[in-house]
C-alpha cells in the first residue's frame, strides 16, 4: 500500500519559479510518452520540448477542457476593535454579501464582532464557524470590495509581495468567473496566439468552472492516505461541455484536461457509464493510484509539490514510476516548478499518446 512518503522527492529551492516568464507559451514542456500500459520506467519515454510545440501532440478530434475561474483578490490585512492585527483569506463567496474565510489572529474572533479591513476602508461582521472557516458578512457586495481593496493571494512558496505584473500573469487569458483563490496554473501557458494556432489546426476547446480553494496548498499530514480529509471546491459543468465530451468520444478523440482542477471537475461529474453529467455542486474528490478514470484521457499540468494530493493525482493518471522518473528528470534538467513553472503532458496509463 502506498503511503505519504512514497510521494516525496528532493527539490532544490532554486527550481521553484518565483515569477512568470515574459511570454506565456515560452515555458518548457516535458512530454511523458507512454509506450506500454505497465507502470515501469521502460514503458515511458521522456521528451523535452517547448510548450509552444504542444500542437504536435494534439489531434483534430481531441478536446481541450479549460477551467475559466478567475482569481479574486482574496487576502486582507486589518485589525479587531481591540487593535489586534488580523489576516483574512477569503476561501469562498457564498452569496452577494457573505464569504467563508480563514482568519489569522492572536485570539479567535467572536461571533457578532467587527473586523476592520484594508486600512479601515470597511468592516465585516463575524458570523458562525463552518469547520475551519469563519462566516464574514460584507457591508457591500463582497466581490466589489474584494476587487477594490483586496490583495492577490499568491501561493505560500512565492516569496515576493504581489504586484501589477502578478495581477496579470497569475490569471489565465480566458478567466471570466470570479471565485478562485488560486490560479488553475496549467492554463497560464496559453495565450491568444497559441489559441489561434489551435483553431487553425482544428483543435476544439471547451470550458468548465471550478473555483480553486486555498485547500489546494493544504499539506497531507498522515502517512495513511485514506485518513486524509480532502478540501471541498465548487464546480459547474455546462450542457455544452457534456455534449462536446460525448461528441469527442463518438469521433474517437481524447478528452484532455488542462490542469488538475479541470480533471477533478470532469471526474467528479462522471457517471458510472463514463458519460459526463451537466450540473454544479461541491467536490472533495481525492484521486490516488488505483483510481479508475472515466472521462479524462490526458492531462496538461505543472509540476507539483512533494507529498501533495496533486502529485498523487498525476501518479494515478500516468503511473507512480512514470511520475518518479519524470520528476527526477525534471530536477536534473532544471525545469521550473510549481505555479509559475513549466508544464508536463501526461497520458493515461491505458492510453497511447
From Swiss-Prot:
Record flagged with keyword Lipid biosynthesis: no
Chain ranges passing through the membrane: none
Superkingdom of the organism of origin: Bacteria
Reaction(s) the record says it catalyses: 7-aminomethyl-7-carbaguanosine(34) in tRNA + S-adenosyl-L-methionine = epoxyqueuosine(34) in tRNA + adenine + L-methionine + 2 H(+)
Pathway: tRNA modification; tRNA-queuosine biosynthesis
Cell compartments where the protein resides: Cytoplasm
EC category name: transferase
Subunit structure, as described in the record: Monomer.
Function in brief: Transfers and isomerizes the ribose moiety from AdoMet to the 7-aminomethyl group of 7-deazaguanine (preQ1-tRNA) to give epoxyqueuosine (oQ-tRNA).
Family that this chain belongs to: Belongs to the QueA family.
Protein name: S-adenosylmethionine:tRNA ribosyltransferase-isomerase
Gene, per the UniProt record: queA
Amino acid at each position: 500500500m502506498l503511503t505519504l512518503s512514497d510521494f516525496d522527492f528532493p527539490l532544490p529551492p532554486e527550481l521553484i519559479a518565483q515569477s512568470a516568464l515574459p511570454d506565456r507559451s515560452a515555458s518548457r514542456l516535458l512530454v511523458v510518452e507512454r509506450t506500454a500500459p505497465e507502470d515501469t520506467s521502460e514503458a515511458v519515454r521522456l521528451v523535452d520540448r517547448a510548450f509552444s510545440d504542444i500542437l504536435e501532440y494534439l489531434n483534430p478530434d481531441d478536446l481541450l477542457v479549460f477551467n475559466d475561474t478567475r482569481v479574486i483578490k482574496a487576502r486582507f490585512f486589518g485589525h479587531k476593535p481591540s487593535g489586534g492585527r488580523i489576516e483574512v483569506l477569503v476561501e469562498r463567496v457564498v452569496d452577494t454579501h457573505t464569504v467563508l474565510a480563514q482568519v489569522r489572529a492572536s485570539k479567535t474572533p467572536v461571533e457578532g464582532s467587527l473586523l476592520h479591513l484594508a486600512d479601515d476602508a470597511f468592516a465585516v461582521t463575524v458570523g458562525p464557524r463552518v469547520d475551519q472557516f469563519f462566516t464574514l458578512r460584507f457591508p457591500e457586495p463582497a466581490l466589489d470590495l474584494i476587487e477594490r481593496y483586496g490583495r492577490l493571494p499568491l501561493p505560500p512558496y512565492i516569496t515576493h509581495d504581489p504586484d501589477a505584473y502578478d495581477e496579470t500573469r497569475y490569471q489565465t487569458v480566458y478567466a471570466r468567473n470570479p471565485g478562485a483563490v488560486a490560479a488553475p496554473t496549467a492554463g497560464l501557458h496559453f495565450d491568444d496566439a497559441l489559441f489561434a494556432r489551435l483553431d487553425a489546426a482544428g483543435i476544439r476547446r471547451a470550458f468548465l468552472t471550478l473555483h480553486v480553494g486555498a485547500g489546494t496548498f493544504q499539506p497531507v499530514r498522515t502517512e495513511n492516505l485514506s485518513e486524509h480529509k480532502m478540501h471541498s471546491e465548487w464546480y459547474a459543468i455546462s450542457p455544452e461541455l457534456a455534449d462536446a465530451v460525448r461528441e469527442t468520444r463518438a469521433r474517437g478523440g481524447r478528452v484532455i484536461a488542462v490542469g488538475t482542477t479541470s480533471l477533478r471537475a470532469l471526474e467528479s461529474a462522471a457517471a458510472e457509464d463514463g458519460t459526463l453529467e451537466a450540473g454544479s455542486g461541491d467536490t472533495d474528490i481525492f484521486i490516488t493510484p488505483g483510481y479508475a478514470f472515466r472521462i479524462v484521457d490526458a492531462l496538461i499540468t505543472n509540476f507539483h509539490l512533494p507529498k501533495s494530493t496533486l502529485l498523487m493525482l498525476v501518479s494515478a493518471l500516468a503511473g507512480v514510476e512514470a511520475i518518479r522518473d519524470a520528476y527526477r528528470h525534471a530536477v536534473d534538467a532544471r525545469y521550473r516548478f510549481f505555479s509559475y513553472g513549466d508544464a508536463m503532458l501526461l497520458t493515461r496509463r491505458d492510453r497511447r499518446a
